[in-house]
């Protein structure tokens, strides 16, 4: 098992740039394998819906102070040398594929190949509405992003026909350090999301326990060996461990 930790780049935990840098350096020293960033453009005071899987709102004080994840990773890559960076998740459909390709390739270059690309759809419809993007097409937009990134990272010159846009045949001089580009990890627990993981990703970002037989059946249909898919549980709790530690400590103090 490998352990990662979330970067405190949002909410009250975001205190200063110096604290962020110290956090990254110390996490690397302690042996964490990956530092994780989230992605949120804004959080309306009147949301159109609650966070998936809950019946409570995500309060604005957590989301009204959210540093740009791409900028944060670039900053922290400069003060570290071994720890990797990933996103849980970067809401890929909200970005134009060309802008995202350049940004991720730049981060891969600046970090000497220590960046992974963790993508999700964003659960918040308000973000799509504000950017003028169709909520119903979010899955198709993610597929478009994935296809363009693959083209950008594996071909040169690059030419691409997207959904309602095109990229003219062009030489792309800045190439990724990692062969084939940063590894792609996808989030989601729905059937379309799991199907996309099996077809298009190196690994799966999950916070839910999907029955193994369901995963294996779906991925087998795509010819995917589950053993080759990396699993990242992006939300974990230490409650049971803390309770056990407290019981042991109590015994020692008696």
Language-model features: locations:
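Active-site-adjacent structural elements that line small-molecule/cofactor binding pockets in enzymes
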Residues: 1-254
């Amino acid at each position: 098992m490998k352990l990662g930790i979330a970067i405190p780049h949002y909410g009250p935990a975001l205190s200063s740039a110096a604290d962020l840098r110290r956090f990254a350096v110390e996490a690397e020293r302690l042996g964490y394998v990956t530092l994780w960033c989230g992605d949120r453009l804004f959080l309306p005071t009147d949301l159109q819906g609650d966070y998936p899987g809950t019946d409570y709102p995500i309060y604005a004080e957590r989301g009204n102070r959210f540093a740009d994840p791409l900028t944060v990773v670039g900053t922290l890559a400069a003060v570290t040398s071994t720890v990797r960076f990933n996103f849980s998740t970067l809401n890929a459909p909200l970005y134009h594929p060309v802008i995202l390709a350049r940004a991720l390739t730049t981060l891969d270059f600046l970090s000497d190949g220590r960046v992974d690309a963790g993508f999700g759809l964003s659960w918040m419809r308000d973000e799509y509405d504000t950017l003028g993007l169709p909520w119903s097409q979010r899955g198709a937009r993610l597929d478009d992003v994935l296809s363009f990134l693959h083209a950008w990272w594996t071909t040169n010159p690059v030419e691409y026909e997207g959904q309602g846009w095109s990229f003219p045949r062009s030489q792309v001089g800045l190439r990724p350090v990692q062969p084939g580009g940063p590894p792609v990890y996808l989030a989601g627990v729905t059937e379309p999301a799991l199907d996309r993981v099996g077809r298009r990703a190196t690994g799966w970002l999950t916070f839910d326990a999907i029955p193994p037989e369901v995963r294996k059946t779906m991925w087998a249909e795509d010819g995917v060996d589950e053993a080759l898919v990396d699993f990242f549980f992006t939300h974990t709790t230490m409650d049971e461990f803390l309770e056990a530690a407290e019981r042991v400590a109590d015994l020692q103090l008696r």
